[in-house]
Amino acid sequence: MIKEELELANKEFEGSDAIFGKNLLTFTNRINSSRGLMFSNMLDQLVPLEHTELPRNYTNYEDMVGKYSSAYYKNDEEKVIVAKLSKFDNNPNAVYILITKNLKTNEYDIIERKAGERLTETYGYKYNNEHIDSLVEGEIINKDEVLYHSTSFNDNLQFGYGVNALSMYTTDPMTIEDAIVISKSLEKKLTSIEYDTVRISLNDNDVLTNYMGDHEKYQCFPNIGEEIKDFVLANRRRISYSQALYDLKDENLRKVLSTDTSYYVPFGDDMVVDINVYCNKDPEQIKRTKYNAQIFDYYDSMIAYYTEIHRTLGEIVERGEKYSDDLAYLYKLSGQIIDPNYKWEDDNKKVFGNIILEITVEKRIGMVEGSKLAGRVGDKGIVSEIREDEDMPILPDGRRVEMIVNILGVGGQMAA
């Protein structure tokens, strides 16, 4: 059995470059096996950057890797956009779906516009949505037309996974033991994107304080497209009837008290990209006040959005048209969301009593001292210092060095 499997594998890889695996993205004829293994390990740990650059030295396998990526949407057949349904009226391009019809097979499908994709934990990648945002109802989408792609691709769908940093080998004392000094400008170029979803449970006696507002405007949390203030997404206060007058005083609602629960989203410049509100009570029985007005604005937007989705998709389903599995799933989901008798569960799989506010945050994560950097030939190091651009060496042509590494490491790594 083992012999047969080996013979089958030998036929599969015979004459193929695929046997080199991830090392096709490095220069296998210029490095030894230890550095090749190091590069392969580092490749598994990389985070997609907000803005990538094409490598100056191509191995010619970068685009092949990008071709098999799932981080872009290429249209498979010629389609027409039947409808564009937006979730937020005041920010129509934040979240929406396109309902399309295949002009060859007459099958209906949906395309969801998202800011990015969340992967394991909070890791993820951002989409470039410029093209899909420019499309309108009635427009034809051509075959092989790319509607959106991750920031690892350029407009020609060429793949990149890092940046080209102007580097200098020297004996700077801050570069000992594989330490690396980078400039402020390189720090910004190495910004990555993460996505976090925060769920805030609100009981009958809970209110969100006026953390984002002022004495004229009550605002509990950032609106779509707004940045988070001081790493705090929202501040929940449980009202005790014995001190309700104190807790609900306008001045105190703009403060964070010791008994409050603050929802933090640390480590980055954060922006809200999506909001959902789930309610297990009859909304008509909940008194609307200034404390929950912002929450119910988003609840009303979500219900209106999914009501329109359910109505539009329902017409397609009831006519007996051909439609995709994605369309069928969204039709069922939208029906659940607008069903007043459907009960939602919390993170503990228990039906909650009042409201859960779900906020999706896009986080811009910059480099800090202690961050790891890796090159394309199995080289790596830890950032020891981030210097101002004017403190970095300057070349005869006026360019500033972006990264300083230890010259003694060259000989040491050649022997590794």
What spans do the regions from the language model cover?
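Long, charge-dense accessory insertions within large macromolecular proteins
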Residues: 1-366, 371-372
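Conserved phosphate-binding elements of NTP-dependent enzyme cores
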Residues: 343-344, 354-416
